[in-house]
Amino acid sequence: MAREKIVIITRNMVGDGAERVIAQLSNYFAAQGKQCCIITLNDDEVFYKLDPSVSVLPVGQKSDNKLKDKLLRYRQVRKMVLQQKPDLVLSMPEEIGVYVLLALQGTKIPVYVSERNNPWVMPDVKVTRMLRTLMYPTAKGLIFQTEMAKSFFPESLQRKGVVLKNPVDPGRIPHQYQGQREKVIVGAGRLSSQKNMPLLLKAFARFAPNHPDYRLRIYGEGELREELTELARSLNIADQVELPGRSTALLEKMNSAAMFVLSSDYEGMPNVLLEAMCMGMPAISTDCPSGGPRELIRDGVNGLLIPVGDETALYNAMERMADPLFAGQMADAAYRIREELTSPEIFVSWYRYLFGEEPKSL
């Protein structure tokens, strides 16, 4: 029997990488004539433009007690899913997937979990990791971003899983910037420990005296905003550092910058790096597990890879990218992967795996 309705469950739709993937998949599924509903655990504002047929149902906070709140939220998730009567459920990121599998036990609804990070590190709560071991075998399918991430799991789970690239809508990715680039170094992502923005600030503090006309601009929100602001002040670079928050026009604002830097300690397949390269930006990234940046960047060919946490290596990479000739070569080579990364076949692969049928031509 054909699958006609999908429910996607996530934390929120406020602007992170997983949510961007959900927005693009939902719009594609809707264009294929499928019914699509997104359930969010939080009741934050929806950051992405969705097809009018895609509904978003927030759960929201249920209690001031952290444990009770989690239990009540997932009880509500179960109730909402049963009301929607979907043919399948897709959940992401991994922590959400663990608890969705638990909440939907006994419903006989097929649940797919999309791993979005480094499984050696995330989930970062011991109880959730234990539950992952127990619950993942009950999933209908698992979606991994890299072969390295897939290799973490036992053979039995690898057999029911698949590695799928992040879908990218070419219509929302600006083309390569033509003209003299701004003397701005851009970072973007959640202001959390995973992204290691302090590394970026410290490397920039070494770079700035040689390049006083450069600025560092970090887009995103998170719990470390005040800490980063204070660090910039203590490094005497506060007047060259900007933290503008989230932006609905992030890619357009990034595109003319001199370089993009991803300083993370670990990632899955980082959307923002992928999109920066699709725009033909000079890009620097840590060679972080679970291997996403390494699949995108060929060091010294279409960008620069540096060891995780290496401040000196990042500073040296910034100095290399400050050379317009070298940066231009890296940018042009990066731009050549746009066609591969924006291929409609990526959307088709997700559709085939989840719905078990061929999509219609759009």
What are the language-model segments listed below?
Residues P137-I173:
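Donor nucleotide-sugar binding/catalytic pocket of nucleotide-sugar-dependent glycosyltransferases
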Residues R246, D265:
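Aromatic "clamp/platform" in nucleotide-sugar-dependent glycosyltransferases that forms part
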Residues D43, S91-G97, E115:
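Short His-centered aromatic/hydrophobic patch
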Residues D16-Q24, K183, R190-P209, I218, ...:
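A conserved mid-protein helix/loop that constitutes part of the nucleotide-sugar donor-binding site
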Residues L296-G300, L304-E311, M318-L325:
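Conserved acidic donor-binding segment of nucleotide-sugar-dependent glycosyltransferases
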Residues L325-F355:
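A charged, aromatic-enriched C-terminal amphipathic alpha-helix characteristic of glycosyltransferases
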Residues P282-D287:
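Short hydrophobic beta-strand element within catalytic cores of glycosyltransferases
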Residues R3, I8-D69, P154:
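N-terminal strand-loop element at the rim of the active site
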